[in-house]
Amino acid sequence: MNTPDFKTFEATALAHGFDEVAERVWPANSEAPTHTHPFSVDALVVLGEMWLTSHGATRHLVAGDTFQLELAVEHAERYGPEGATYWAARRKAPATA
């Protein structure tokens, strides 16, 4: 797989209706316990490895892998001995009246 550079990933995500794109860098052996976000995510792992648990299943992700999370989905994250970096395209929840 040809991994795009960040600017290309960002431009593609914004063209597909995402609101923002962020680079997330996690230190070695860190964890993010079960939580939710007020946005949906389409992400690309670019360095290291991580484990993402949602809907009762855990996925092992390495550089080049993608993952998606819908708005407010409970999930947990765990990062490998070298940490991990991923690019996350975020789509915020529509405003309510």
Pin down the residues of each PLM region:
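Conserved short histidine dyad/triad with adjacent acidic residue
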Residues: 20-37, 71-72
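Short, charged/polar surface micro-motifs in flexible loops or helix N-caps
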Residues: 28-29, 47-50, 93-94
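Amphipathic, hydrophobic secondary-structure cores in small proteins
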Residues: 32, 37, 53-55, 63
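Short acidic-glycine-tyrosine-enriched beta hairpin
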Residues: 55-72
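Short, conserved beta-strand element in jelly-roll/cupin
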Residues: 36-52
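Ligand-binding loop in jelly-roll beta-barrel domains
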Residues: 71-97
